[in-house]
Structure formats: C-alpha cells, structure tokens
C-alpha cells in the first residue's frame, strides 16, 4: 500500500483499521496477513497441536495396557516403566510431526524446572484422557510449575520474581474476567452500580460482562 493511501486511515478507530486490514488480507491470498484479532485469529500454531495429538495417541496406548480382555476399553496410566515406554514411542514415531516437540517439552521440564519425566508423563496422560476427574480442583501440579515459570519470565521484566503464587486455570479469558468480577463482588470490593474504568479497544465480552444484571457496573472507557 502506498504511503499516501495510508494517510486516509489516520482518522479511523482501531476497530475500523482492523476491519480494513482483514479486508486487505482476504483480497491478497498470495500474501496473507496474520490477524491476531480480539480472540479470533485467522491462524493456528500447528506444531504444538501435532505434539498434543501425539501425546493423546501415547496416552491411549497406555490406557489400552489395562483391561486387555475387554475390547474398546482401557484403564488408568501405569507409572512403572512409563518413561521407557515413552522413549520407545518416540523412537517408533521418529519423523512424525509433533514428536520432536513433545520430547523437547518433556526434556525441558526436567532440565530447566526439575520435573521428573515419569511424573510429568503420568500427569499429562491422565489429564489428556480425563482420568481422576474432577481432580485437581484448581490446576495440574506440574502444569502450574511450568506456567509459573513462564509468568516469571514474561512478567518479571528482567528482575528477580521469586515470590510464590498460586495459579487457577480457567476455560479462557472471558471466563477469567467473569470470575474476577464475581470475586470482587463477593468480597464487597465492588458492589452493584459501582463505576469501573476499562481500557479499550478490548475483546468485546470484557465490555459486556460488567453490564450484566449480576453486576450492573457503570463503565468508563479509557480509549487507547
């Protein structure tokens, strides 16, 4: 796009600019642009998904080691010899998309975070199959360790960030916002009819949730 053409977009809102960029991207498929969007991107990262599905296949193999006399049934993951069986699975699927990513993740957790591979594999296999539901009630133990390390790295701004904290995994950003508002209300920090400030533009549900009958907050938008 020519510089002179860009000038006419100066007066558009961020949402209007976003819509125009999507229009341009869809009209030039030979040079598609990635749309980070507001929760609905036009792309997916494929490598982690390949790794996820390979983990699922391995977990199913582990489940099928139990109840072998019953067709189409499986049991809980057995911890004894689990790491050795995983290593064989990786070797047998050398070159398959996602295998290297999965193995590298297990190796990283051991070397960087001190998580025993067998313990992590047991937890991952149980989780992806859905064993022991609804335990845990908050977050998988080793997943919390991994996520906490990520948060320390990304939000520590290069400074030491060693204070312990708990994490609570939720369904997604919208659910998280709902829980935040509900917690603030239950603890009497916010009450029905209170005024809150919200930075915008932002994912639309974040603007809509405070208006629900449960909260009825008065919103003041802080435009970016």
Where is each model-derived feature located?
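Conserved N-terminal helix/loop that builds the PLP phosphate-binding region
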Residues: 1-105
């Amino acid at each position: 796009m020519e510089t002179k053409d860009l000038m006419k977009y100066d007066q558009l809102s961020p949402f209007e600019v976003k819509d125009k960029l999507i229009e341009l991207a869809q009209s030039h498929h030979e040079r598609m642009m990635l749309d980070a969007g507001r929760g609905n991107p036009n792309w997916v990262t494929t490598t982690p998904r390949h790794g996820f599905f390979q983990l699922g296949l391995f977990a199913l193999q582990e489940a099928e080691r139990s109840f072998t006399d019953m067709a189409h049934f499986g049991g809980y993951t057995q911890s004894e010899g689990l790491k050795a069986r995983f290593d064989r699975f990786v070797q047998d699927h050398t070159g398959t998309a996602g295998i290297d990513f999965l193995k590298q993740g297990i190796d990283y957790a051991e070397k960087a975070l001190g998580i025993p591979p067998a313990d992590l594999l047991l937890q991952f296999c149980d989780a992806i199959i859905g064993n022991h539901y609804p335990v845990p009630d908050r977050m998988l133990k080793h997943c919390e360790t991994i996520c906490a390390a990520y948060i320390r790295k990304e939000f520590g701004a290069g400074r030491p960030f060693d204070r312990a904290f708990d994490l609570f995994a939720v369904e997604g950003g919208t659910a998280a916002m709902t829980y935040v508002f509900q917690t603030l209300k239950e603890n009497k920090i916010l009450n029905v009819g209170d005024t809150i400030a919200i930075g915008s533009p932002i994912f639309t549900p974040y603007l809509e949730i405070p208006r629900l009958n449960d909260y009825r907050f008065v919103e003041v938008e802080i435009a970016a």
